[in-house]
C-alpha cells in the first residue's frame, strides 16, 4: 500500500472530520500514531492544545495518539533523538494549528522533514492541517505576518514536501474558502483575492496553488 499525504483545510479536530480520520486510521492498523506539537509550540497553552487533541482522537476517533515534543529547533542530543525515535516508528504523523513560520523556523535544517518523508516511504500516513499544511509546498504563506501584523505580502520558503514525495510543484493553501471576514474578503487563508493574485505572480512559472477548503481534505497517494 502506498504512503498517503493528507492535507486538511481546517477543522482537524471538529466533528466533521471524525469519519475521515477513522477511515485514514484504517490504513494504519495498530501501528503507532504521533502528534507533532511544533506549530503551536510558542503558545503558553501548548500543553492544553496537545491534551485536547489527544482526547479528541481517543474519544471521537477511537485511537490512542502520543505527542512528540518538538517545540523548538532541538539541538542534537537526547531530547531530539527521543523525538526522532518516536517519529521514525510512527505510521501516522499529524501536525495542525499554530503558526506556519514558527513551525518552519524549528523544522528547517533538522532531520524532521526527512522523517516525514520516511513515514510516507514506509507506507505510512502524514496528516497536515491548517498551519502545518501551509508548510508543505515550495512556498508558504506567512499568514500571521501578513493578516495580523500588516507586513507586505511575501512568500516564505516551504518544506517542498509535496514535490519531494510525488513530484508536484505545489504551493498549499488551506482555509481556501474562508468566509470569516463577512463583507471583507478572507478567502485563500485570509489573503483575499487581490493579495493572492499579486503573490502568485512572484511564484516560479511551474508552481501552482493547491487550495483546500475548510473542513475538506486532499489525499495524495505516494
Please give the residue ranges for each predicted region.
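A residue-level signal for conserved active-site and pocket-lining positions in enzyme catalytic cores
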Residues: 33, 93, 130, 172, ...
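Glycine-rich nucleotide phosphate-binding loop and flanking beta-alpha elements
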Residues: 13-14, 100-101, 133-135, 216-218
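Conserved small/polar residues in nucleotide/adenosyl-binding loops
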Residues: 220-222
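A conserved mid-domain beta-alpha-beta active-site/ligand-binding segment of alpha/beta enzyme cores
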Residues: 168, 173-203, 212-214
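N-terminal beta1-alpha1 cap of cysteine-dependent amidohydrolase-like domains
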Residues: 1-96
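Active-site-proximal beta-strand/loop segments in catalytic clefts of secreted hydrolases
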Residues: 9-11, 36-39, 97-98, 131, ...
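Class I SAM-dependent methyltransferase SAM-binding "motif I" and its flanking Rossmann-like core
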Residues: 96, 104-186
